UniProtKB/Swiss-Prot annotation:
The keyword Transferase applies. Keywords: Acetylation, Mitochondrion, Transferase. It comes from Rattus norvegicus (Rat). Pfam families: DSBA. The modification N6-acetyllysine is found at residues 68, 74, 85, 93, 116, 158, 165, 167, 177. Glutathione binds at residues 16-18, 53, 183, 200-201. The gene is Gstk1. It is found in: Mitochondrion matrix. One of its GO terms (molecular function) is glutathione transferase activity. The modification N6-succinyllysine is found at residues 36, 49, 68, 74, 93, 116, 144, 158, 167, 177, 193. Belongs to the GST superfamily. Kappa family. This is Glutathione S-transferase kappa 1. Glutathione S-transferase that catalyzes the conjugation of glutathione to exogenous and endogenous compounds. It catalyses: RX + glutathione = an S-substituted glutathione + a halide anion + H(+).
Length: 226
Protein backbone atom coordinates (compact mmCIF):
# COMPACT_ATOMS: atom_id res chain seq x y z
CA UNK A 1 0.00 0.00 0.00
CA UNK A 2 1.16 3.51 -0.81
CA UNK A 3 1.04 6.52 1.49
CA UNK A 4 -2.36 7.68 2.68
CA UNK A 5 -3.92 10.50 0.64
CA UNK A 6 -3.35 14.02 1.94
CA UNK A 7 -6.59 15.74 2.90
CA UNK A 8 -7.45 19.01 1.16
CA UNK A 9 -10.39 21.10 2.32
CA UNK A 10 -11.76 23.54 -0.26
CA UNK A 11 -13.94 26.28 1.20
CA UNK A 12 -15.99 28.02 -1.48
CA UNK A 13 -19.04 30.12 -2.29
CA UNK A 14 -20.65 30.05 -5.74
CA UNK A 15 -20.78 33.86 -5.65
CA UNK A 16 -17.00 33.82 -6.17
CA UNK A 17 -15.71 33.21 -9.72
CA UNK A 18 -12.24 32.50 -8.36
CA UNK A 19 -13.75 29.79 -6.19
CA UNK A 20 -15.02 28.17 -9.39
CA UNK A 21 -11.54 28.20 -10.88
CA UNK A 22 -9.98 26.67 -7.78
CA UNK A 23 -12.78 24.12 -7.58
CA UNK A 24 -12.31 22.94 -11.18
CA UNK A 25 -8.54 22.67 -10.83
CA UNK A 26 -8.76 20.60 -7.65
CA UNK A 27 -11.53 18.44 -9.10
CA UNK A 28 -9.18 17.69 -12.01
CA UNK A 29 -6.13 17.01 -9.85
CA UNK A 30 -7.98 14.80 -7.38
CA UNK A 31 -7.66 12.10 -10.04
CA UNK A 32 -3.93 12.74 -10.52
CA UNK A 33 -2.54 13.55 -7.08
CA UNK A 34 -2.60 11.41 -3.94
CA UNK A 35 -5.21 13.58 -2.24
CA UNK A 36 -8.64 13.34 -0.67
CA UNK A 37 -10.63 16.43 -1.63
CA UNK A 38 -13.27 17.65 0.81
CA UNK A 39 -15.64 20.22 -0.67
CA UNK A 40 -16.84 22.62 2.03
CA UNK A 41 -19.60 25.07 1.06
CA UNK A 42 -19.17 28.28 3.08
CA UNK A 43 -20.59 31.79 3.09
CA UNK A 44 -18.32 34.47 1.66
CA UNK A 45 -20.24 37.25 3.40
CA UNK A 46 -19.61 35.65 6.78
CA UNK A 47 -15.89 35.33 6.12
CA UNK A 48 -15.67 38.94 4.97
CA UNK A 49 -17.47 40.12 8.08
CA UNK A 50 -15.26 38.08 10.39
CA UNK A 51 -12.01 39.20 8.76
CA UNK A 52 -12.96 42.82 8.12
CA UNK A 53 -12.26 42.29 4.42
CA UNK A 54 -14.46 43.07 1.42
CA UNK A 55 -14.89 41.31 -1.93
CA UNK A 56 -12.49 42.51 -4.67
CA UNK A 57 -15.43 43.51 -6.87
CA UNK A 58 -16.50 46.06 -4.24
CA UNK A 59 -13.23 47.98 -4.69
CA UNK A 60 -13.66 50.09 -7.86
CA UNK A 61 -10.22 49.52 -9.39
CA UNK A 62 -10.29 45.83 -8.54
CA UNK A 63 -13.78 45.55 -9.98
CA UNK A 64 -12.61 47.00 -13.29
CA UNK A 65 -9.63 44.67 -13.26
CA UNK A 66 -11.86 41.63 -12.76
CA UNK A 67 -13.92 42.57 -15.83
CA UNK A 68 -10.75 42.39 -17.92
CA UNK A 69 -9.22 39.38 -16.21
CA UNK A 70 -12.11 36.91 -16.32
CA UNK A 71 -12.14 36.52 -20.13
CA UNK A 72 -8.43 35.64 -19.94
CA UNK A 73 -8.93 33.22 -17.04
CA UNK A 74 -11.75 31.58 -19.00
CA UNK A 75 -9.24 30.65 -21.69
CA UNK A 76 -6.40 29.69 -19.35
CA UNK A 77 -8.48 27.50 -17.04
CA UNK A 78 -10.88 26.28 -19.74
CA UNK A 79 -13.87 27.13 -17.59
CA UNK A 80 -16.88 28.62 -19.44
CA UNK A 81 -17.24 31.79 -17.37
CA UNK A 82 -18.29 35.31 -18.26
CA UNK A 83 -19.16 38.33 -16.14
CA UNK A 84 -22.92 38.72 -15.52
CA UNK A 85 -24.43 41.90 -16.95
CA UNK A 86 -25.67 43.22 -13.61
CA UNK A 87 -23.49 41.31 -11.19
CA UNK A 88 -23.68 43.88 -8.38
CA UNK A 89 -27.42 44.44 -8.67
CA UNK A 90 -28.57 40.90 -9.36
CA UNK A 91 -26.13 38.65 -7.57
CA UNK A 92 -24.07 40.53 -4.97
CA UNK A 93 -27.04 42.32 -3.41
CA UNK A 94 -29.23 39.21 -3.38
CA UNK A 95 -26.43 37.03 -2.05
CA UNK A 96 -26.12 33.26 -2.07
CA UNK A 97 -27.41 32.26 1.36
CA UNK A 98 -30.11 29.91 0.07
CA UNK A 99 -27.84 28.40 -2.58
CA UNK A 100 -25.09 27.74 -0.04
CA UNK A 101 -27.59 26.30 2.43
CA UNK A 102 -28.80 24.01 -0.34
CA UNK A 103 -25.24 22.87 -1.05
CA UNK A 104 -24.78 22.34 2.67
CA UNK A 105 -27.86 20.10 2.69
CA UNK A 106 -26.46 18.22 -0.31
CA UNK A 107 -23.15 17.74 1.50
CA UNK A 108 -24.98 16.33 4.52
CA UNK A 109 -27.36 13.94 2.76
CA UNK A 110 -26.06 13.28 -0.75
CA UNK A 111 -22.35 14.22 -0.79
CA UNK A 112 -21.68 12.30 -4.00
CA UNK A 113 -23.75 14.97 -5.81
CA UNK A 114 -22.00 17.98 -4.27
CA UNK A 115 -19.45 18.47 -7.05
CA UNK A 116 -22.03 18.37 -9.85
CA UNK A 117 -24.62 20.55 -8.12
CA UNK A 118 -22.00 23.14 -7.15
CA UNK A 119 -20.83 23.29 -10.76
CA UNK A 120 -24.36 23.82 -12.05
CA UNK A 121 -24.93 26.72 -9.65
CA UNK A 122 -21.71 28.35 -10.88
CA UNK A 123 -22.86 27.73 -14.44
CA UNK A 124 -26.09 29.59 -13.75
CA UNK A 125 -24.37 32.71 -12.40
CA UNK A 126 -21.04 32.80 -14.16
CA UNK A 127 -21.81 31.21 -17.51
CA UNK A 128 -25.49 31.84 -18.31
CA UNK A 129 -26.17 34.90 -16.10
CA UNK A 130 -29.14 33.26 -14.41
CA UNK A 131 -30.63 33.58 -10.95
CA UNK A 132 -29.85 31.19 -8.08
CA UNK A 133 -31.85 32.84 -5.31
CA UNK A 134 -35.31 31.58 -6.24
CA UNK A 135 -36.25 28.07 -5.14
CA UNK A 136 -37.23 26.94 -8.63
CA UNK A 137 -33.86 28.00 -10.02
CA UNK A 138 -31.98 26.10 -7.33
CA UNK A 139 -34.12 23.07 -8.15
CA UNK A 140 -33.34 23.47 -11.84
CA UNK A 141 -29.61 23.47 -11.13
CA UNK A 142 -29.92 20.32 -9.02
CA UNK A 143 -31.99 18.56 -11.69
CA UNK A 144 -29.55 19.58 -14.42
CA UNK A 145 -26.78 18.07 -12.29
CA UNK A 146 -28.66 14.76 -12.36
CA UNK A 147 -30.47 14.84 -9.03
CA UNK A 148 -33.98 13.43 -8.91
CA UNK A 149 -36.67 16.09 -8.57
CA UNK A 150 -38.12 14.58 -5.40
CA UNK A 151 -34.70 14.46 -3.74
CA UNK A 152 -33.90 18.02 -4.80
CA UNK A 153 -37.20 19.23 -3.35
CA UNK A 154 -36.52 17.30 -0.15
CA UNK A 155 -33.14 19.00 0.24
CA UNK A 156 -34.58 22.39 -0.64
CA UNK A 157 -37.08 21.97 2.18
CA UNK A 158 -34.12 21.44 4.51
CA UNK A 159 -32.54 24.87 3.94
CA UNK A 160 -34.85 26.53 6.46
CA UNK A 161 -33.99 24.04 9.20
CA UNK A 162 -31.69 24.97 12.05
CA UNK A 163 -29.63 21.84 11.35
CA UNK A 164 -28.60 23.09 7.90
CA UNK A 165 -28.22 26.72 8.96
CA UNK A 166 -26.02 25.64 11.85
CA UNK A 167 -23.88 23.45 9.60
CA UNK A 168 -23.24 26.32 7.17
CA UNK A 169 -22.31 28.62 10.06
CA UNK A 170 -20.04 25.90 11.42
CA UNK A 171 -18.25 25.44 8.09
CA UNK A 172 -17.88 29.19 7.60
CA UNK A 173 -16.55 29.45 11.15
CA UNK A 174 -14.06 26.67 10.48
CA UNK A 175 -12.68 28.61 7.52
CA UNK A 176 -12.37 31.70 9.72
CA UNK A 177 -10.51 29.72 12.38
CA UNK A 178 -8.00 28.64 9.75
CA UNK A 179 -7.43 32.34 9.03
CA UNK A 180 -9.56 32.73 5.89
CA UNK A 181 -10.16 36.27 4.66
CA UNK A 182 -11.78 35.39 1.34
CA UNK A 183 -12.67 32.51 -0.94
CA UNK A 184 -11.55 30.13 -2.28
CA UNK A 185 -9.53 28.99 0.70
CA UNK A 186 -7.72 25.68 0.48
CA UNK A 187 -6.50 23.99 3.65
CA UNK A 188 -3.89 21.28 3.13
CA UNK A 189 -3.12 18.75 5.85
CA UNK A 190 0.40 17.52 5.14
CA UNK A 191 2.55 15.38 7.45
CA UNK A 192 0.92 16.66 10.61
CA UNK A 193 1.01 20.30 9.50
CA UNK A 194 -1.81 22.52 8.29
CA UNK A 195 -1.38 25.05 5.50
CA UNK A 196 -4.01 27.65 4.58
CA UNK A 197 -3.78 28.94 1.01
CA UNK A 198 -5.94 31.70 -0.44
CA UNK A 199 -7.03 32.06 -4.04
CA UNK A 200 -7.14 30.01 -7.22
CA UNK A 201 -3.57 30.97 -8.12
CA UNK A 202 -1.80 29.11 -5.30
CA UNK A 203 -1.95 25.69 -6.93
CA UNK A 204 1.75 25.53 -7.79
CA UNK A 205 2.57 26.25 -4.15
CA UNK A 206 0.04 23.60 -3.12
CA UNK A 207 1.73 21.06 -5.40
CA UNK A 208 5.07 21.92 -3.80
CA UNK A 209 3.68 21.37 -0.30
CA UNK A 210 2.19 18.04 -1.37
CA UNK A 211 5.31 16.89 -3.19
CA UNK A 212 3.23 16.53 -6.35
CA UNK A 213 3.76 17.69 -9.94
CA UNK A 214 1.99 20.82 -11.12
CA UNK A 215 1.05 20.60 -14.80
CA UNK A 216 -0.98 23.77 -15.17
CA UNK A 217 -4.70 24.37 -14.64
CA UNK A 218 -5.59 21.87 -17.38
CA UNK A 219 -3.13 18.99 -16.97
CA UNK A 220 -2.10 17.20 -20.20
CA UNK A 221 -3.29 13.85 -18.90
CA UNK A 222 -6.76 15.36 -18.52
CA UNK A 223 -6.67 16.58 -22.12
CA UNK A 224 -5.69 13.08 -23.21
CA UNK A 225 -8.75 11.62 -21.44
CA UNK A 226 -11.03 14.25 -22.92
Amino acid sequence: MGPAPRVLELFYDVLSPYSWLGFEVLCRYQHLWNIKLKLRPALLAGIMKDSGNQPPAMVPHKGQYILKEIPLLKQLFQVPMSVPKDFFGEHVKKGTVNAMRFLTAVSMEQPEMLEKVSRELWMRIWSRDEDITESQNILSAAEKAGMATAQAQHLLNKISTELVKSKLRETTGAACKYGAFGLPTTVAHVDGKTYMLFGSDRMELLAYLLGEKWMGPVPPTLNARL
